[in-house]
Amino acid sequence: MQYFIDTANLESIKKISDIFPIAGVTTNPTIIAKEKRDFKDIINDIFDIIGRDKIVHAQAVGSTAEIMIKEVKLLHDTFGENFYTKIPVTPEGIKAIKNLAKDGYKITATGILSPQQIIMAAEAGAEYMAPYINRSDNIGENGIEIVKDAYKILEMAKKTDEEKLARYKRIFEPKILGASFKNVRQVHEAILA
């Protein structure tokens, strides 16, 4: 299990990372915009606080696969091996994930609202899957059940590793990164899933 801080506020990151054993930081365009600073400066400052051995997730903002691919390559060249780009599980996002994963780029599939999206993102080669728990609940789905289904799906996918190892330049070990929590109960239930 890994714990991530979901913020770009440097003071909060300093305080929390000083106390808790975190794996890294997650952000999104809205969180970054609240800081009213340059994106690259924020990400570099986050790495300076938590260390380059920790993980930072930040989202691509392109609307087409081609733009996302260019963006991901630039971001990974800028921030290094522990930088993961969050790509939404839209058709264009899946296309970008598929193309980037085969070249070894580290991708987090985000905006997941169904088990089918987890299957597509995992098959495309995303390493982290970020199902939106509360947002799923708000549209009549059960966010925790999606996490439970995700674990089952990913365990089945791991059994077909040989084909995936040939397809991708890294070990296929997808992970669940729960997102869009609104209360502690949701976090607790996701951990138990």
Per-segment meaning from a language model:
Residues 2-14, 19-22, 27-99:
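Active-site beta->alpha loop and helix N-cap motifs at the rims of alpha/beta catalytic domains
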Residues 4-6, 34, 57-64, 81-90, ...:
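Catalytic beta/alpha-barrel core
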Residues 11-19, 67-71, 96, 114-124, ...:
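Catalytic cores of alpha/beta
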Residues 19-24, 79-81, 99-108, 123-130, ...:
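Glycine-enriched alpha-helix->loop->beta-strand junction motifs that scaffold or abut catalytic
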Residues 40, 44-55, 94-105, 143-176:
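Alpha-helix-loop-beta-strand connector modules within alpha/beta enzyme cores
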Residues 119-127, 141-152:
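Active-site-proximal loop->helix
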